[in-house]
Swiss-Prot record:
Residues 12-485 form the UvrD-like helicase ATP-binding domain. GO terms for biological process: double-strand break repair via homologous recombination. It catalyses: Couples ATP hydrolysis with the unwinding of duplex DNA by translocating in the 3'-5' direction; ATP + H2O = ADP + phosphate + H(+). The heterodimer acts as both an ATP-dependent DNA helicase and an ATP-dependent, dual-direction single-stranded exonuclease. Recognizes the chi site generating a DNA molecule suitable for the initiation of homologous recombination. The AddA nuclease domain is required for chi fragment generation; this subunit has the helicase and 3' -> 5' nuclease activities. Its EC number is 3.1.-.-, 5.6.2.4. This is ATP-dependent helicase/nuclease subunit A. GO terms for molecular function: 3'-5' DNA helicase activity; 3'-5' exonuclease activity; ATP binding; ATP hydrolysis activity; double-stranded DNA binding. It comes from Bacillus cereus (strain ATCC 10987 / NRS 248). PROSITE patterns: UVRD_HELICASE_ATP_BIND, UVRD_HELICASE_CTER. InterPro entries: AddA, DNA_helicase_UvrD-like_C, DNA_helicase_UvrD/REP, P-loop_NTPase, PDDEXK-like_dom_sf, PDDEXK_AddAB-type, Restrct_endonuc-II-like, UvrD-like_ATP-bd. Keywords: ATP-binding, DNA damage, DNA repair, DNA-binding, Exonuclease, Helicase, Hydrolase, Isomerase, Nuclease, Nucleotide-binding. The keyword Nuclease applies. The gene is addA. Heterodimer of AddA and AddB/RexB. Residues 505-805 form the UvrD-like helicase C-terminal domain.
């Protein structure tokens, strides 16, 4: 095949593998692109090569390019556009390239959801959806789900003899609420939607519990758990073998070898049984009997070795004991009874999920909205149809897309899910060996399993495809990294060669997967990767787990602050690729990566204390902000003033300003009843002299509260919020506090959030507050408003997920000692794509519950997937660094942890034993054992090479491994003597003398006045419309006159207002029609209607705007004398933009500045016609006239002439300047009444 592909050009910078990825053709291709390997450049080059191919060029709109984010899609379009423009410079006459540039904007280069949207918009008639549907936001979606689920459960509770439902409720809800049941239904709904056929997946889930006529060996759960049994028995055998080796050492307890050999025989028997069947293992486990260790005189042997032997044997026995208790304490048939008992309950649960899905879809359909999963499923529904055997096959639409797309290219393929894979499959060729699917990704960077991404899709193809592409698809490995120094790459490889394998990690980190150096850097100092392990002594640990976490965050933050400050102050150098030289490091070159953001606030605070600018896009802390908390309490009180805690919080806040004594005084006036009732009662009576101030405060607030409550019933939530801000003065108040801009930004975010909420189909303060409470219950806080831009010279703190795709010269990866988040494994029920549903067996009558086989299998499977995912997350973190990688973790007892980690030194293989890798509870449990097998750890360990092979011990990588004493980090820093004196003076509020040589310069700058003050009060650039308004004084304008003539009409309440377009939107729509109406065709209703429909298709008008166009008024214009002149004109120009310079005094009546100043004026002329005797200017107006003037149009005419005279005069002046011909006539045409007004000077 390779001979038929273009050869790599001489002097090309592409590697052989990159070039292969650019030009390979004729089959499905999977490119495994390692971090920093230039995959985007390869993808763009492949597209360009296809477009400019001389023999078989492909139009860019015949390629489907699927990206992971909208930003990536836009970047891809930009890169393709730039590349095409470069080609055009070399081939300026190429019409083909010019065509591609014009096609680029409508090319299918987008996210999968955007492509789905495109398919649905084109074939909406095949679905039961309104073509004008909108994408629901998360807020609305959550509220709808809650509403639908409440209705369904309420109906179920009302059905008599609903035995199975109440059995389900008894098993999976608490006495207080049915929240757990609701969570189960929603979780099953969400998981099912990640599959191409949700109902089929749900049905399989129920079928798995139908065990009639089956044995335990028939269950998929038992088969999987048997593999786990083998794994644990193998781990136990390794412990015994290690113990035997130690016992046979010269100082070892040799008499115990015989017992250890018996242990090995016992474990061998169990392993043999595990290879046979579940029943065999069960029977073997009932006969387990460990021999008693022979007594020895410990003083005759090395005490440490004896302890190690005994410890290893106990570990082995614990492994077996754990299996006995979890899996083999019950007879096999008892597990089957669990499934039989749970089957009808699970069937009912799935039925509820199906009903929920159906009702939820119906409600969204009624509201004309869809969510992102709907986009995928609707698209799949259009692209597929059912075959005779019930399987999905491509529909006629799918076949059309197959014919259209010459190739489908998928970026970040490792993050694809099952539904997306099906969509891609239906628009590409069936055969992999002759396919047209090009996939790029790195499964080692697949870190979105929580979003239901399925890395197994990538892995399956990677194992199936070959490098030659024989008999199927082709795989290409891009292993060269063009981002990082050798030290970063070698350090990453050294760790991952030891921890990532197929059994534990899902990926074999072999020679093809290793990162290879592709970048060239100048020699650098101090570029070795580092592991800093902080020892947190018992004395330092604050009480409680939460306190310990805070302490760890503080220790790591302080260490990072010290290192950053030292590197900046010392002029540590990094390479600048733009200037091809080394330069001093800046704060923006540093990033601190965290697995999640709970530590970020403490790290930010510590860095700020050290004077280091820092930025983090926090997704938490918003509702904890004092100003937001106070405002939320205000709104809770407006909704229901009987709530004591929110009301007390508001009364105590700066809004009302009661102190503790005043609050107590109020409460003393009524010990019974709510605070609100007591306050109402207090205000009805006459206050005592000493209570008058309290009375005044409360009366002020009470009156405001009544007004707000009334306002909330009639007006919008967002208007209410701004009204509260204004009437309390609280928005201005927080602006004067420290970090005032940030606080005001937070309050604006609350207002914006309310407006977003109101854009949904929900309304009202109560629903809004309930939604916020739901957010807080789920722990989904929002981040505080941004007050610092991302482009500032600051140290950035971000999650590892956020850093994906980014690179930084210096990377700190912190929190490596934090435990993995295994909370999902502890839930009362578990869900898995392959194994379905698993929960405890619960018998509410006997009040017993225990673990089931399905729960154990799913838990084990999920744990192994979690371990694999965490490995990939660590890989992403380490590969963000360009020049310097610093890993930091904190441990409670370094000696104890090191003892555990040093077990790895006893193994001679590159890949650490499965039990070490699978047993990790944090990243340090992988990193430290790996590094402790390298020579650079010997300074710390002083243990020597031992039995570690040379290729591991002497691997070509540089590391600095150090244990840092936490006490040294917490010691206070000394304060310089002069700074101490200054601080003392400030504390005593003494004046501090100004000792600066620039006092005069500072004074001059502060007192300086701008020489063009007048110009600052007027814009240098104006539109014609703004100039027109400037000429209309407030009292003398026609607007004021019209207001006087209008009949007194009261504003219609909002709930009675008709929804529709605004006047401005209607006017824009009419102008658009007048701009695009075809003057060569007959002006009839049918023709105009057809043209309007065409404008909607071209997205020049919306459906709503099209419906509002009064076609008869358009026709009336062309039937008028002026309209006939337009049709008969020599030439007609419409929507003519212009820009001209105008004397400032002409534009501004109040101008008092220098004469000769000019301003830039811009505008758009609706229509100009050229006739034999000159140019006529026409301006279309959609003003409402009928009913506004008692004297009819005769009264309106002089007012309208005056209103638009300046505007048309400027238009005429602009035309005369540009065309060098006089304008003979200026006309206004009013659609309301078919009136023409000629403007005379």
């Amino acid at each position: 095949m390779m001979e038929n592909w273009p050869k790599k050009p001489e002097g090309s910078q592409w590697t052989d593998d990159q070039w292969k990825a650019v030009v390979a053709n004729g089959r499905d291709i999977l490119v495994a692109a390692a971090a920093g390997s230039g995959k985007t450049a390869v993808l763009v080059e492949r597209i360009i090569k296809k477009i400019i191919n001389e023999e078989n060029p492909v139009d860019v709109d015949r390629l489907l390019v699927v990206t992971f984010t909208n930003a990536a899609a836009q970047e891809m379009k930009n890169r393709i556009g730039e590349a095409l423009e470069k080609v055009l410079i070399d081939e300026p006459g190429s019409q083909h390239i010019r065509k591609q540039l014009s096609l680029l904007n409508k090319a299918s280069i987008s996210t999968i959801h955007s492509f789905c949207l495109q398919v649905i918009r084109g074939y909406y008639y095949m679905l039961d959806v309104d073509p004008r549907f909108r994408i629901a936001n998360q807020t609305e979606n959550e509220l709808l789900k809650e509403e639908v689920l409440d209705d369904i459960l309420e109906e179920e509770y009302g059905i008599e003899d609903n035995t199975i439902f109440f059995e389900l409720v008894d098993r999976y809800t608490s006495d207080r609420s049915d929240d757990d049941l609701q969570r189960m239904i929603l979780a099953l709904h969400t998981e099912s939607r990640a599959h191409p056929n949700p109902e089929k997946w749900l049905d399989k889930l129920v079928e798995a519990y139908d065990v009639e006529g089956k044995t335990i060996e028939d269950l998929v759960y038992a088969s999987y758990l048997l593999e786990d049994v083998k794994f644990q028995l193998e781990t136990a055998e390794q412990h015994i073998r290690k113990a035997t080796e130690l016992a046979m050492l010269p100082d070892g307890p040799a008499p115990r070898v015989e017992t250890l050999q018996a242990d090995l025989a016992l474990l061998g028997t169990l392993s043999s049984a595990a290879r046979e069947s579940w029943t065999s293992v069960y029977e073997a486990m009932q006969n387990v009997s460990w021999q008693t260790l022979k007594r020895i005189k410990k003083s005759d042997y090395n005490e440490d070795i004896v302890k190690q032997v005994d410890s290893l044997r106990n570990k082995a026995k614990d492994e077996v004991k754990k299996l006995q208790e979890e899996l083999f304490s019950r007879k096999p048939e008892s597990f089957l009874r669990d499934f039989q008992d749970m089957h009808p309950v699970l069937e009912k649960l799935v039925q509820l999920v199906k009903v929920f899905t159906e009702r939820f879809q119906a409600m969204k359909r009624d509201k004309g909205m869809v969510d992102f999963t709907d986009l995928e499923h609707f698209c799949l529904q259009i692209l597929s149809e059912q075959s005779e055997n019930g399987e999905m096959k491509p529909s006629a639409v799918a076949l059309q897309y197959r014919n259209k797309f010459a190739e489908v290219l998928v970026d970040e393929y490792q993050d694809t899910n099952f539904v997306q894979e099906s969509i891609i499959k239906f628009v590409t060729k069936d055969s992999e060996s002759e396919g047209n699917l090009f996939m790029v990704g790195d499964v080692k960077q697949s870190i979105y399993r929580f979003r239901l991404a399925e890395p197994g899709l990538f892995l399956g193809k990677y194992k199936r495809f070959t490098q030659e592409g024989l008999g199927g698809g082709m795989k290409i490995d891009l292993a060269k990294n063009f981002r990082s120094r050798h030290e970063v790459l070698a350090g990453t490889n050294f760790i991952f060669k030891q921890i990532m394998g197929e059994e534990v990690g899902e990926i074999d980190y072999d020679a093809d997967a290793e990162l290879k150096l592709g970048a060239s850097y100048p020699e650098g100092e101090d570029v070795a990767a580092e592991l800093l392990c902080i020892q947190q002594t018992e004395e330092e640990v604050i009480d409680g787990e939460e306190g310990a976490e805070v302490e760890k965050a503080q220790l790591e933050a302080r260490l990072m602050a010290q290192r950053i400050k030292a590197m900046v102050d010392s002029g540590y150098e990094v390479y600048d690729r733009k200037t091809d030289s080394m330069r001093p490091v800046q704060y923006r070159d540093f990033v601190i990566l965290l697995r999640s953001m709970p530590w970020a606030p403490q790290i930010m605070e510590e860095l700020k204390l050290q004077g280091i600018p820092v930025y983090a896009d926090l997704a938490t802390g918003y509702f904890e902000a004092t100003e937001v908390n106070i405002m939320m309490n205000v709104f809770r009180v407006i909704d229901n003033p009987m709530q004591d805690i929110p009301l007390a919080a508001v009364l105590r806040s700066p809004i009302v300003g009661l102190n503790d004594e005043e609050l107590a005084t109020l409460r003393a006036h009524g010990k019974k009843g709510s605070f609100y009732e007591v306050m109402s009662s207090f205000l009805k009576g006459a206050p005592l002299e000493e209570e008058k101030e309290l009375h005044d405060k409360l009366e002020w607030f009470y009156n405001l509260l009544q007004g707000w409550r009334e306002f909330a019933r009639q007006q919008s939530l967002s208007d209410l919020i701004w009204k509260v801000y204004g009437e309390t003065g609280y928005y201005d108040f927080v602006g004067g506090l420290p970090a005032g801009k940030q606080r005001q930004a937070n309050l604006r975010v609350l207002y914006d959030r309310a407006r977003q909420y109101e854009a949904t189909s929900f309304r009202g303060l109560f629903r809004f507050l309930r939604f916020i409470e739901r957010i807080l219950e789920r722990g989904d806080d929002m981040g505080t408003a941004r007050a610092l831009g991302e482009q500032e010279d600051v140290v950035r703190i971000m999650t590892i997920h956020k850093s994906k795709g980014l690179e930084f010269p210096v990377v700190f990866v912190a929190g490596l000692g934090r435990r993995f988040n295994t909370q999902d494994l502890m839930k009362r029920f578990l869900l898995h794509k392959d194994f379905g549903f698993g929960s405890q067996f619960i018998d509410p009558r006997k009040r017993i519950k225990y673990t089931t086989l399905s729960q154990l299998a799913i838990k084990r499977k999920m744990k192994m997937e979690l371990i694999a995912e965490e490995m990939r997350v660590l890989y992403v973190a380490l590969t963000r660094a360009k020049e310097k990688l610093i890993l930091i973790g904190t441990v409670k007892d370094a000696n104890k942890e090191m003892e555990k980690w040093l077990d790895a030194r006893e193994h001679s293989e590159w890949l650490l034993p499965d039990h070490i890798r699978a047993g990790a509870s944090c990243y340090l449990d992988w990193i430290a054992p790996s590094l402790y097998r390298h020579r650079d750890s010997e300074i710390l360990l002083e243990l020597g090479q031992g039995s570690i092979p040379d290729e591991i011990y002497g691997y070509d990588t540089s590391w600095k491994v150090e244990v840092v004493d936490g006490n040294t980090l917490l010691a206070p820093e000394p304060v310089q003597e002069e700074k101490q004196e200054l601080l003392e003076a400030l504390r005593e509020k003494k004046a501090v003398p100004l000792q600066s040589e620039r006092k005069e310069e500072v004074y001059d700058r502060l007192m300086w006045k701008y020489g063009y003050e007048e110009a600052t009060s007027h814009r240098a650039k104006q539109s014609v419309t703004e100039i027109k308004r400037n000429y209309q004084s407030e009292e003398g304008s026609d607007n004021a006159f019209i207001k006087k003539l209008r009949a007194p009409i009261q504003t219609r309440p909002r709930f009675m207002e008709k929804k529709g377009l605004t006047y401005a939107e209607r006017g824009t729509a009419v102008h658009a029609v007048m701009q695009h109406v075809d003057l060569k065709k007959p002006i009839t209703e049918e023709v105009i209607r057809e043209q309007i429909a065409g404008m909607v298709n071209k997205e020049l008008l919306t459906f709503e705007q099209a419906e509002e166009i009064a076609i008869e008024k358009v026709i009336s214009f062309f039937d008028s004398d002026l309209g006939k002149r337009v049709l008969a004109a020599k030439s007609v120009e419409r929507e003519v933009p212009f820009t001209m310079m105008l004397a400032a005094e002409e534009a501004y009546q109040d101008w008092q500045g220098k004469s000769g100043e000019s301003i830039l004026v811009q505008g758009v002329i609706d229509c100009m016609i050229e006739e034999e005797d000159g140019i006529t200017l026409i301006d279309f107006k959609t003003d409402t006239i009928a009913g506004k003037f008692p004297g009819g149009f005769d009264q309106a005419k002089p007012i309208l002439e005056e209103r638009y005279k300046v505007q048309l005069s400027l238009y005429a002046k602009a035309l005369e300047k540009s065309l060098q011909h006089p304008v003979k006539e200026k006309c206004l045409y009013f659609f309301d009444g078919n009136h023409v007004v000629k403007i005379e000077e």
